[in-house]
């Protein structure tokens, strides 16, 4: 799908594609991404037909792409849900598109992400959304509630932040609590921090990960 060669960093396999990194680590999972706060993530593919053929050849149970449909959902190992969307105008083979949250408190989520990360509130089709450079955050009203992400197949999401140490100090001054406060990891040449949003989404913040 991403047509990229993974780079190994310790226990991590890192896949780079336009505007995003996908990090894989072998671990036990408490459940699929569907049913958690982050229901799925979406990528765009320039050649949808070729992409679906490759996924089918790789063993994925592929749904039929309906005429006029913008994309399809596939389920990877461990139940990670991925939406593949068609964008023939894309210059790269694949690119990140959106992260899709499911929770009953969508308006509050939209406000929190816009304020915390300096995003622009918007609508994506019928959904509340926030535009952040490189990715769209989409929020769907899900009355049944959703489980926290930590420990599930899609364990956390992440954002690359310039001057992360100063950014973390700003969040702390605003009352944000960190699970892992800002620190430098010299062996990886990055700065990082972890926090959990008010609805249970585990979030990694990095400074330098985009150089991997």
Regions found by a protein language model. Name each.
Residues 1-29:
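N-terminal, post-signal-peptide region of Sec/Tat-exported proteins
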Residues 1-5, 50-58, 105-121, 173-174:
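Amphipathic alpha-helical segments
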Residues 5-6, 22-24, 31-32, 51, ...:
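Short loop/beta submotifs within extracellular cysteine-rich repeat domains
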Residues 31-33, 41, 46, 50:
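Post-signal peptide N-terminal segment of secreted/secretory-pathway proteins
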Residues 32-33, 90-93, 147-149:
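Short glycine/serine/proline-enriched coil/turn segments at secondary-structure junctions
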Residues 37-40, 153-156:
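Eukaryotic phosphotyrosine signaling hubs
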Residues 43-47, 101-107, 160-162:
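Short, surface-exposed ligand-recognition loops at beta-strand->loop->(often short) alpha-helix junctions
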Residues 52-101, 123-124, 129-132, 136-142, ...:
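Vicinal oxygen chelate
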């Amino acid at each position: 799908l991403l047509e990229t060669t993974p780079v190994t960093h310790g226990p991590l396999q890192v896949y780079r594609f336009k505007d995003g990194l996908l990090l894989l680590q072998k671990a036990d999972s408490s459940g699929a991404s569907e049913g958690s706060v982050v229901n799925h993530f979406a990528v765009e593919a320039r050649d949808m037909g070729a992409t679906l053929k490759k996924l089918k050849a790789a063993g994925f149970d592929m749904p039929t792409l309906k005429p006029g449909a913008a994309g399809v959902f596939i389920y990877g190992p461990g139940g990670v849900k991925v939406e593949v969307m068609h964008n023939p105008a894309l210059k790269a083979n694949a690119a990140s598109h959106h992260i899709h949250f499911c929770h009953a408190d969508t308006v509050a989520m939209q406000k929190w992400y816009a304020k915390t990360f300096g995003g622009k509130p918007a609508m994506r089709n019928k959904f509340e959304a926030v535009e952040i450079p490189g990715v769209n955050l989409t929020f769907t009203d899900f009355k049944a509630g959703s489980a926290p992400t930590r420990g599930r197949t899609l364990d956390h999401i992440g954002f690359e932040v310039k001057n992360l140490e100063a950014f973390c100090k700003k969040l702390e001054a605003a009352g944000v609590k960190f699970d892992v406060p800002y620190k430098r990891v010299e062996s990886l040449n990055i700065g990082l921090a972890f926090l959990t949003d008010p609805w249970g989404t585990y979030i990694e913040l990095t400074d330098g990960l985009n150089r991997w």
